[in-house]
């Protein structure tokens, strides 16, 4: 720490700290319109002028130095601040009382008040541009835009979508999308970063317009008249009185606008933010404090909330009678469930029943679901959808390092010298994590290697893009491990001190020469050698992977090979290193963590451990089953075999997300009794005998656990719709109807029980998770957590990691003469899985209304296919009819079909092949043939972002503004400072 002096008072500061941050931390008020702590210095507004050692400088662009004398309110500084703000007001019409942004957080309004601006010295001049309304979620008003550049900085350097810029050389500058396109036809992915950081009302969510204020829902003509009245009064009264009126109106808003913290319900990143509501109307999503995401969101988290108030929400229980569903009371539904489950248990035993927890539900709900199965019914037949995607990654980590989760945090990924992404379309599946990689790669020199069979965004940004043959990643991973060991490039010190099994591991690598790997994978020896050298040279490496690794017949072994490589190179235990299996759902990590698994109770405590069972039996006052239960895959087999008679599924579209969907549906038809609990009448509900209406995330409390093991609280934003109940309450009521005596009144009581039974969560409670606080497991009883794992030792009895030998077998379903094409599948940015939630947001439906199959240009030319052509895909297990999109994202005989349709489901084509270690389906090993049908329209509308043309640049490029002939530096002797990069 160093000492500086601010307005005569000594203040401690970090050596590389910006003056503006020290001033704010000291409790001083200083205008700073363009500066945002999560964006860094932009230097466009000039309002943060201060005197440093007698010279005017921008506080946002000056780093502290020992002994520095800073004056924030000298005559020179104050005059410069006011002069700069006058320039801003010439670009912005103040009509705060009738503005939807008059909510206490408008930087322009607050700065006008701070500087006690009474009169506008430079007249406002509207810009000669129309308001751009072409994006379904937000609008841009150029005449209200102050050209601060925050939105550009956020788009170029935080989100790194590189869509926004400012045409500084134009006589009337404005923010541009793709250099001049409409927003709707640009490359904008609707992440919302720009709207979030806008300091005024130039960029606003459409859900706010006409809704936030008492006087904002006016006809345009009436609004214009009121603005004219305000402007007419201003010369005589000044802004003081006008602002007082607007602040009264703002204070009135405070009584009807609620701001409630929640955690995103979509992917596993764990974004958290405030939800602004007026009654049941969702005004906006406001990210600011999230420990995982900061200001960042994606289209789904920022705008994808149409499902909450959708007209087709389930609002009462349904019972099937005579082949039709009728509405029922809760008493009816619960009584029927209890009677039928009890009868089946009595007739065919507890193991003839099975339960599926939801990765969309909370930790507490997953815990109660497995408790219902085990302590009330008496079966370990409980699973969740991690079986479909993440179980192989968990196995790979359990084998090698001992914990089945990310070894560090998102911040570690940012710090890495080298990031490898294998089998993950990160920019679309985990977009906020992708922003951190893209930003570090663009701004900080981070190296990026991507391995995938599809050239998605991260592949195109990579320093090296590996395109191996399908299902061969294990081969080149093992080959690189061997190369590093053979060439003395492994981390010997780390291996000697922290790793067991090196000799046997070396022997297992015998077949994996670079030449053999090249032959199998199709990658060249030169490319593989270059990759190995980059890995050896990197001081800190992280590896990210997802379903492109796990959803193979050797998903567990390939995940193991990744962790082996990290051990060989010593890339555990240190910041900026580690293994990151990116979890798919918002709480797929938490569902597994909290016992919704056939072999483990909460905290991965084995069901066959007598000590573990005894502890739970004492607490629950029951005897527990002693043997491992059935997983998802085995449940379907057991139904067909006549052994499984009943299922209870919560929030899982199992009929179409499981592989070989036709086989799963035929199994469901054989069940004697089937309960489905969901928020919509899903495809799976069609097979149910009873449907129970659960509550989405905004209508309940609880916790989610993100991909980085981060446990976070979500708070109830809205009351449950109709007769819906929170899922934890439904499970409690079912258990009690079956004779249990559960007395939970709030999810916090469930978490307290979890902590009492589970060493991994011993210190987790709701007080420690208040607001935006979070904990990353394992959490000791005193509340201390571990953002970075293995700093003391690895999670084995001897404290050492284990190299685990794996061999390569090859894919199970390979193309042949009859089924000559390889079908890949996965997510889209704008939809989540089959779209049960996202299709209910109209703007997302407009942007991406249809499913499609991607076809390579060469295959399209060979088969006579154009974008829009209807094709029939036929596999050994089923067929679908779908329209084609011709794109170079795929090549050769590769096809890619996203999963965003319950009606044209890709899992009609996938088979029942599995990873034998986990029973995870080999979704990515599917062969099909293609039949060309008739022509049609492109399934992607012109307003889809994939047709845009980004305009990459280094931030806002403020130097171009400074070169304008009409630019005047406020004050005398302003020092133009090129901000030095922060020293590591």
Locations of regions flagged by a protein language model:
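Short acidic-glycine loop/turn motifs at beta-strand connectors
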Residues: 53, 65, 276-281, 876
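N-terminal cofactor/phosphate-binding cores enriched in small/glycine residues
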Residues: 11-66
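Catalytic alpha/large subunits of respiratory electron-transfer oxidoreductases
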Residues: 93, 196, 225-700, 734, ...
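Fe-S ferredoxin-like electron-transfer domains
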Residues: 46-47, 52-262
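Long, low-complexity segments enriched in small/aliphatic residues
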Residues: 582, 589-598, 615, 747-843
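Short beta-alpha connecting loops at secondary-structure transitions
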Residues: 5, 66-72, 177-180, 460-468, ...
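Long, contiguous, secondary-structure-rich segments that constitute the structural scaffold
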Residues: 721-723, 727-775, 834, 839-854, ...
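A glycine-rich phosphate-binding loop feature that marks nucleotide/adenosyl-phosphate handling sites
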Residues: 101-102, 172, 210-218, 358-359, ...
């Amino acid at each position: 720490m160093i000492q500086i002096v601010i307005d005569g008072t000594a203040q401690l500061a970090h050596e590389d700290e910006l003056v503006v941050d020290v001033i704010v931390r000291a409790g001083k008020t200083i205008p700073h319109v363009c500066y945002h702590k999560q964006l860094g210095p932009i230097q466009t507004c000039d309002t943060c002028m201060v005197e440093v050692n007698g010279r005017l400088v921008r506080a946002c662009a000056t780093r502290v130095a020992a002994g520095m004398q800073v004056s924030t309110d000298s005559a020179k500084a104050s005059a410069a601040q006011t002069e700069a703000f006058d320039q801003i007001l010439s670009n912005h019409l103040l009509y705060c009382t009738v503005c939807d942004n008059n909510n206490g957080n408008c930087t322009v309004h607050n700065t006008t008040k701070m500087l006690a601006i009474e009169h506008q010295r430079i007249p406002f001049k509207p810009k000669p541009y129309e308001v751009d309304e072409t994006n379904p979620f937000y609008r841009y008003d150029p005449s209200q835009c102050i050209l601060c550049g925050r939105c550009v900085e956020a788009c170029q350097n935080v989100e790194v979508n590189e869509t926004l810029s400012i045409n500084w050389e134009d006589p009337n500058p404005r923010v541009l999308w793709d250099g001049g396109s409409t927003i709707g036809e640009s490359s904008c992915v609707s992440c919302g970063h720009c709207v979030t950081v806008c300091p005024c009302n130039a960029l606003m969510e459409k859900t706010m317009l006409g809704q936030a204020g008492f006087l904002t829902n006016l006809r345009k003509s009436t609004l214009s008249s009121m603005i004219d009245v305000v402007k007419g009064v201003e010369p005589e009264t000044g802004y003081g009185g006008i602002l007082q009126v607007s602040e009264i109106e703002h204070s009135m808003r405070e009584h009807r606008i609620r701001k409630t913290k929640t955690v995103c319900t979509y992917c596993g990143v764990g974004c958290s933010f405030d939800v602004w509501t007026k009654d049941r109307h969702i005004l906006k999503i406001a990210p600011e404090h999230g420990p995982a995401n900061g200001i960042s969101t994606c289209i789904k988290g920022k705008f994808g909330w149409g499902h909450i108030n959708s007209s087709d929400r389930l609002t009462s229980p349904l019972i099937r009678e005579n082949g039709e569903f009728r509405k029922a009371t809760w008493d009816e539904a619960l009584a029927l469930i209890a009677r039928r489950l009890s009868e089946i248990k009595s007739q065919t035993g507890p193991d003839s029943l099975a339960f599926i927890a939801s990765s969309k539900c909370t930790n507490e709900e997953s815990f109660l679901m497995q408790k219902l199965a085990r302590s009330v019914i008496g079966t370990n037949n409980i699973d969740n959808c991690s079986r479909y995607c993440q179980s192989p990654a968990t196995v790979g980590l359990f084998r090698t390092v001992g914990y089945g989760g990310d070894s560090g945090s998102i911040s570690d990924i940012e710090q890495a010298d080298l990031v490898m992404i294998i089998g993950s379309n990160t920019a679309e599946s985990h977009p906020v994590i992708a922003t951190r990689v893209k930003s570090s790669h663009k701004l900080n020199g981070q190296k990026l290697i991507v391995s995938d069979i599809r050239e998605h965004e991260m592949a195109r940004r990579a320093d090296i893009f590996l395109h191996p043959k399908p299902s061969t990643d294990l081969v080149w991973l093992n080959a690189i491990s061997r190369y590093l060991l053979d060439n003395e490039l492994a981390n010997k010190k780390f291996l000697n001190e922290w790793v067991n099994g090196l000799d046997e591991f070396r022997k297992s690598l015998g077949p994996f020469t670079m030449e053999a790997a090249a032959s199998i994978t199709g990658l060249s020896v030169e490319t593989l050698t270059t990759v190995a050298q980059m890995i050896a040279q990197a001081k800190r490496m992280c590896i990210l992977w997802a379903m492109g690794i796990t959803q193979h017949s050797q998903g567990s072994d390939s995940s193991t090979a990744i962790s082996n490589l990290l051990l060989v190179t010593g890339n555990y235990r240190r910041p900026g290193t580690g293994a990151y299996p990116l979890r798919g759902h918002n709480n797929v990590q938490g569902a597994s963590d909290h016992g919704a698994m056939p072999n483990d109770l909460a905290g991965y405590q084995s069901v066959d451990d007598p000590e573990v069972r005894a502890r739970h039996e004492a607490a629950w006052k029951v005897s527990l089953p002693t043997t491992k239960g059935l997983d998802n895959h085995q449940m379907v087999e057991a139904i067909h075999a006549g052994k499984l008679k009943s299922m209870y599924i919560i929030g899982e579209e199992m009929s179409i997300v499981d592989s070989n969907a036709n086989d799963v549906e035929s199994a469901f038809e054989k069940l004697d009794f089937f309960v489905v609990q969901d928020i919509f009448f899903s495809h799976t509900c069609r097979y149910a005998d009873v449907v129970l209406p659960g509550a989405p995330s905004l209508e309940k409390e609880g916790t989610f656990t993100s991909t980085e093991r981060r446990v976070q609280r979500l708070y109830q934003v809205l009351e449950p719709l109709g007769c819906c109940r929170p899922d934890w309450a439904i499970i409690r009521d079912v258990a009690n109807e079956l004779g249990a005596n559960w007395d939970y009144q709030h999810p916090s009581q469930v978490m307290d029980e979890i902590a009492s039974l589970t060493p991994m969560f011993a210190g987790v409670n709701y007080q420690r998770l208040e607001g935006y606080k979070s904990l990353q497991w394992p959490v000791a009883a005193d509340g201390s957590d571990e953002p970075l794992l293995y700093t003391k030792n690895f999670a084995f009895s001897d404290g050492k990691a284990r190299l685990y030998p794996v061999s390569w077998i090859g894919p199970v379903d390979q193309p042949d003469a009859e089924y000559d094409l390889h079908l890949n599948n996965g997510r889209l940015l704008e939809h989540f899985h089959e779209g049960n939630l996202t299709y209910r947001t109209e703007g997302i439906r407009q942007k991406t209304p249809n499913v499609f199959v991607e076809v390579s240009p060469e295959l399209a030319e060979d088969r006579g296919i154009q974008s829009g052509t209807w094709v029939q895909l036929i596999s050994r297990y089923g067929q679908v009819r779908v329209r084609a999109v011709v794109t170079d994202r795929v090549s050769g005989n590769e096809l890619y079909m996203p999963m965003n349709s319950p009606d044209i489901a890709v899992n009609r084509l996938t088979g029942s092949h599995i990873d034998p270690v986990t029973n995870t389906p080999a979704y990515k090993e599917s062969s099909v043939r293609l039949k060309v049908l008739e022509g049609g329209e492109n399934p992607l509308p012109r307003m889809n972002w994939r047709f845009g043309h980004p305009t990459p640049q280094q931030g806002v490029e403020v130097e171009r503004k400074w070169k304008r002939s009409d630019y005047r530096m406020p004050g005398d002797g302003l020092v133009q400072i090129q901000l030095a990069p922060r020293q590591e």
